[in-house]
């Protein structure tokens, strides 16, 4: 059990809290006794019981307070470390704005150019990794893992605790780096990057060790073997693993796999998107500094980035087909997944695939507080400019609430249009940031036009936005598109942008039918006052994750996360995610030291009498699996006879 360390201030605060609670309780008891003397006199036993219960409750509160560690155990006490902030992460940074914000630069064909999507400011150029670079990374990681794989949990927890404290104390810097490279707002970064990452670290510290303990399994059912044979699964590191992560959460998507890899005793080579190389370099350096501060090998974590494959450069495919990887987690799009799976198959590397989604937000007739729901819908659709794999892609509303909810949302977006821009330097108040690039603007506009041509109504937005302050920024108008039907392209394809799509359903079953009509199956939400009906919908949705009367809460650390159908397969997160990065070694052993397996004489080579050997095995099987006590006794006599 972990030791608890309380400083003097905490002890004084604890004492004063308990004393105040106790004094309040005494005051209430005295008031009762003064106001009802006769009742007290006639119910001394009741008062005694009440006093005892209150005392037990007070003791329980005290124990709960003390048993909640204020600091980590000394075995993994966090280590402080620092990291210089990059120049572009400084507040009010005056970076040069580029005419072209493409990652390609004809003058430097082997380099990746990085820009701030919100402003167009140039962040720097980085050489695309070569096949030789990849080999070196895998080799270094493998060498570091050979020692790290045998580390005890206190060393691993020390690294995570140190990382936890750094993130908690440097939120502004981390958010600014993430925003500068992705174009999102500081608020979106705080919730989508920092909060969820700290939760993952803290959950792993608190529950991860228990998940990786050997798992004893019941059995065998064989009557003879069950008395002296035990079986368990021991979870061992795989070695060097890889994670190929998307750009929409440059901090969280990068750190999530690293946290899981380090805790399970693995080394990891992370391949970030070419869109967020600048921030990924800083974040991986943060991890390596943390490892160094904890006296661990920083080579445990490596960062790779490559330009998309061409005839002259196939490094990206070389990475995913590398035989040094024992496991790959991919977060990205469906088209890219096909290439990754094809490459990974060359070395038989297992892959967890987390792809896009077309998550439905279902509002049933029993849902009442539509104003509150409109706030959830707005946040779930427009956060990070809609670039969220579990963002709301379709709002499916049963007929009783449809028109009212459409009006509420349209009125909100008309009266208070979402302000677009950049708040990285806190120069203005904004609601929605930029998109990562303008590469998909033609596609988004075409989806809207197709829907309108087929009968949908465009109430807000629908096209790209030329920002007056940031003409090089990548902005798309917050869009409200209603009366969408399944035959429209926007109902079947992932938008991954700030387009609020609304679909009208006839009834609850029609809500489910519409939700399941898309080829994806990542997540979904259902809202209503009838819990039985909500559970019916949740059980009927063909998805990997569902939230009831909430949005995206299935992305909590204790649950495995992943989709089905066109959204991929496999899970990361939760206990299952940790176990998936381990070799589940099945071990069978003797539980009684004086009993061991021997080959019976009738079965020993060479077989001296086939008939006797057959009868021996037959009697053994009967004795092992019969439900009749008499049959088992007879088999024992037969075994004794045939064994001679």
Curated annotation (Swiss-Prot):
Gene Ontology molecular function: any one: aldehyde dehydrogenase (NAD+) activity
Keywords carried by this UniProt record: Endoplasmic reticulum, Glycoprotein, Oxidoreductase
Active site per UniProt: 354 (proton acceptor), 389 (nucleophile)
GO cellular component: endoplasmic reticulum
Entry PTM: N-glycosylated.
Residues carrying the site annotation Transition state stabilizer: 248
Primary site of residence: endoplasmic reticulum
EC numbers for this chain: 1.2.1.-
PROSITE patterns: ALDEHYDE_DEHYDR_CYS, ALDEHYDE_DEHYDR_GLU
Compartments, as annotated in UniProt: Endoplasmic reticulum
Aminoacyl-tRNA synthetase listed as a keyword: no
Class of the enzyme per the UniProt entry, highest EC level: oxidoreductase
SUPFAM superfamilies: ALDH-like
Glycan-bearing residues: 15, 565, 627
A GO BP entry: reciprocal meiotic recombination
Stored InterPro entries: Ald_DH/histidinol_DH, Ald_DH_C, Ald_DH_CS_CYS, Ald_DH_CS_GLU, Ald_DH_N, Aldehyde_DH_dom
Pfam families: Aldedh (PF00171)
Family membership noted in the UniProt record: Belongs to the aldehyde dehydrogenase family.
PANTHER family cross-referenced by the UniProt entry: ALDEHYDE DEHYDROGENASE-RELATED (PTHR11699)
More about this protein: Present with 2500 molecules/cell in log phase SD medium.
Name under which the protein is recorded: Putative aldehyde dehydrogenase-like protein YHR039C
Primary gene name: MSC7
């Amino acid at each position: 059990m972990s030791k608890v360390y309380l400083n003097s201030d905490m002890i004084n605060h604890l004492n004063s809290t308990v004393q105040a609670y106790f004094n309040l309780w005494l005051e209430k008891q005295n008031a009762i006794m003064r106001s009802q003397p006769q009742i007290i006199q006639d119910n001394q036993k009741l008062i005694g019981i009440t006093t005892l219960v209150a005392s037990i409750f007070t003791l329980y509160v005290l124990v709960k307070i003390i048993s909640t560690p204020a600091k980590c155990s000394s075995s993994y006490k966090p280590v402080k470390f620092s990291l210089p902030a990059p120049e572009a992460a400084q507040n009010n940074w005056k970076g040069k704005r580029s005419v072209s914000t493409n990652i390609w630069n004809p003058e430097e064909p082997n380099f990746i150019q990085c820009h701030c999507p919100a402003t167009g400011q140039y962040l720097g150029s980085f050489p695309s990794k070569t096949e030789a670079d990849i080999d070196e990374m895998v080799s270094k990681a493998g060498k570091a893992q050979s020692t790290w794989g045998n580390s005890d949990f206190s060393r691993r927890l020390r690294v995570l605790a140190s990382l936890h404290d750094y993130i908690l104390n440097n939120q502004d810097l981390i958010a600014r780096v993430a925003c500068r490279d992705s174009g999102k707002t500081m608020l979106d970064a705080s919730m989508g990057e920092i909060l969820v990452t700290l939760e993952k670290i803290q959950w792993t510290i608190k529950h991860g060790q228990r998940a990786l303990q050997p798992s004893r399994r019941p059995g065998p059912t064989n009557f003879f073997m069950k008395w002296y044979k035990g079986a368990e699964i021991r979870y061992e590191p795989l070695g060097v693993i890889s994670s190929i992560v998307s750009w929409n959460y440059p901090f969280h998507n990068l750190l999530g796999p690293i946290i899981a890899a380090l805790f399970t005793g693995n080394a990891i080579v992370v391949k970030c998107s070419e869109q967020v190389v600048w921030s990924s370099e800083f974040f991986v350096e943060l991890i390596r500094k943390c490892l160094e501060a904890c006296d661990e090998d920083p080579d445990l974590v490596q960062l790779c980035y490559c330009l998309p494959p061409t005839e002259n450069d196939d490094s990206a495919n070389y990475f995913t087909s590398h035989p040094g990887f024992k496991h790959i987690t991919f977060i990205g799009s469906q088209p890219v997944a096909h290439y990754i799976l094809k490459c990974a198959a060359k070395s038989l590397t297992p892959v967890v695939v987390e792809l896009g989604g077309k998550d439905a937000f279902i509002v049933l007739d029993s849902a009442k507080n539509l104003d509150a729901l409109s706030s959830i819908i707005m946040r779930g659709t427009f956060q990070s400019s809609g670039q969220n794999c579990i963002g709301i892609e379709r709002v499916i509303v049963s007929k009783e609430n449809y028109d009212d909810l459409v009006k509420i949302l349209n009125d909100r977006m008309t009266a208070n249009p979402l302000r677009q821009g950049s708040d990285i330097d806190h120069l203005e108040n904004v609601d929605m940031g930029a998109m990562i690039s303008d590469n998909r603007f033609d596609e988004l506009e075409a989806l809207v036009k197709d829907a309108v041509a087929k009968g949908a109504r465009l109430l807000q937005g629908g096209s790209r936005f030329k920002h007056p302050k940031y003409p090089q920024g990548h902005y798309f108008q917050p869009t409200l598109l209603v009366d969408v039907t399944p035959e429209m392209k926007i109902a079947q394809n992932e938008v991954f942008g700030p387009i609020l799509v609304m679909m009208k359903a006839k009834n609850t079953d029609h809500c489910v039918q519409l939700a399941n009509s898309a080829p994806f199956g990542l997540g979904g939400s259902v809202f209503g006052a009838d819990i039985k009906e909500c559970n019916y919908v949740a059980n009927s949705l063909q998805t990997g994750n569902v939230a009831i009367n909430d949005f995206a809460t299935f992305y909590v650390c204790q649950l495995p996360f992943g989709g089905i159908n066109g959204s991929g397969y496999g899970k990361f997160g939760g206990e299952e995610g940790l176990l998936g990065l381990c070799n589940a070694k099945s071990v069978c052993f003797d539980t009684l030291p004086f009993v061991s397996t021997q080959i019976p004489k009738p079965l020993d080579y060479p077989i001296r009498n086939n008939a006797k050997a057959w009868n021996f095995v037959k009697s053994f099987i009967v004795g092992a699996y019969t439900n009749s006590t008499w049959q088992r006794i007879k088999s024992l006599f037969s075994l004794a006879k045939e064994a001679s």
